[in-house]
A protein has these predicted regions:
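Generic "edge-of-domain/loop-turn" microfeature
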Residues: 11, 33, 41-43
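C-terminal basic regulatory modules in eukaryotic proteins
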Residues: 37-70
């Protein structure tokens, strides 16, 4: 399970919906971050790489907004 920080609190729900659309478990936290996990990821490294790819895609599709795996 990894944490992802967003630049805008208003992006919390749209970002979680984006992750869920690619079958990632995503939970919005009160501090404005997202806790995410990839079901069936064989290793933590695989999970990090896959989530990093989704974060990169989100950032490319949403100019001026950013998400970052922390």
């Amino acid at each position: 399970m990894l944490s992802i920080r967003l630049s805008r609190p208003t992006d919390l729900e749209p970002f979680c919906a984006f992750l869920r659309s690619v079958h990632v478990h995503a939970e919005a936290l009160e501090d404005g971050s997202v806790r995410a996990s990839v079901p069936g990821a064989p290793t933590p490294l695989h999970e990090r790489r896959e989530l990093s790819g989704y974060v990169t895609t989100w950032n490319a599709l949403n100019p001026g907004r950013s998400a970052e795996v922390v």
